[in-house]
Regions:
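Iron-sulfur (Fe-S) cluster-binding modules
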Residues: 1-75, 86, 90-98, 121-282
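Short substrate-entry loop that stabilizes the transition state in hydrolases
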Residues: 83
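Catalytic or ion-translocation cores adjacent to nucleophile or general acid/base/metal-coordination motifs
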Residues: 101
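Short aromatic-enriched loop/helix-cap "lid" or pocket-rim segments at secondary-structure transitions
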Residues: 113
Length: 282
């Protein structure tokens, strides 16, 4: 827990940002926090962040990629998809006092976790002209499957206000105030009419973690789960509602296999649907 690792550091704590298999969107969210970061520069020092530093030669680039450490707080983006990733995250954990995973890839495997439901060699053969040059693991897994994680920040991409809250909370030695309720709460707070009740639009809001501000429902589009499962989601009821809204079994499976495909809750939807189809009617 971050509260147990809160800074008892007399000098400025050091921050490191790491990339694994991802699109860099969550790192860009940190760079987008321009004014907020300026306000924190006297309290924390960014020591390792490839996205915001100039390129170097091969030797310097390798050293910067691996990082020297130790670091007080590491933010890790991306999932583990190669043997090299699996080895490097162990190194990152060893040189990090606190480790926070940021984004759907790091917390739930990302879209690349679609390989978990198929044969990765089939994907490689379909995409690459020379598949023999590609070395990838059979699955894409979150960081927590490989090393202990002190806090997870969800989203695709993460919310900038939540990111600043995590950094500020670490500096203050307290638990980050990140809500664990569903997107439905955010719709009510901003006065958005429920699009499922009013229009029959399929929406994952009831089982999706809050954090986006309910942007999609505000524009008449159903939530598609980019922040991953909420706390204790009722997936059985959600699947039943999606059926009533006219979604096919294949589309129900697809809607849960997007940004957070490897989350245990969303990954179980296929088994849940099969179980219900085999059950005799009440």
């Amino acid at each position: 827990m971050l509260t147990e690792l809160g800074p008892v550091i007399r000098t400025r704590p050091t921050l490191a940002v790491w990339k694994f298999a991802s699109c860099d969107g969550c790192q860009l969210t940190l760079l987008d926090c321009e004014n907020e970061l300026l306000g924190l520069t006297d309290r924390i020092r960014v020591d390792h962040f490839l996205e915001m530093t100039p390129a170097e030669g091969a030797e310097g680039g390798r050293a910067r990629l691996e990082g020297r450490g130790p670091y007080d707080l590491s933010l890790v983006e991306g999932s583990i998809t190669t043997a090299g990733d699996a080895e490097r995250i162990q190194h990152v954990r060893r040189i990090s006092r606190a480790l926070v995973t940021i984004g759907a890839c790091a917390t739930a495997g990302g879209v690349q976790a679609l390989r978990n439901f198929a044969d990765v060699d089939d994907f490689i053969a379909a995409v690459y002209a020379r598949p023999e040059y590609i070395a990838a693991l059979e699955t894409s897994t979150p960081i927590s499957a490989h090393v202990p994680v002190d806090f997870e920040l969800r989203g695709c991409p993460i919310d900038r206000r939540q990111l600043i809250e995590v950094i500020t909370a670490y500096l203050a030695g307290r638990t980050p105030q990140i809500p664990d309720h569903s997107v439905c709460f955010e719709c009510k707070r901003r006065g958005t009419t429920c699009i499922t009740v009013a229009h029959g639009t399929p929406c994952l809001g009831p089982v999706t973690h809050a954090g986006c501000g309910a942007i999609c429902p505000a524009y008449g589009r159903g939530c598609y789960g980019c922040f991953g499962p909420s706390s204790r989601p009722n997936l059985r009821s959600m699947v039943a509602q999606l059926r009533r809204d006219g979604m096919s079994e294949r589309d129900i499976q697809r809607v849960f296999r997007t940004f957070n495909a490897a989350s245990p809750e969303y990954a179980s939807v296929s088994d849940l649907a099969a179980e219900e189809q085999q059950s005799p009617p009440a």
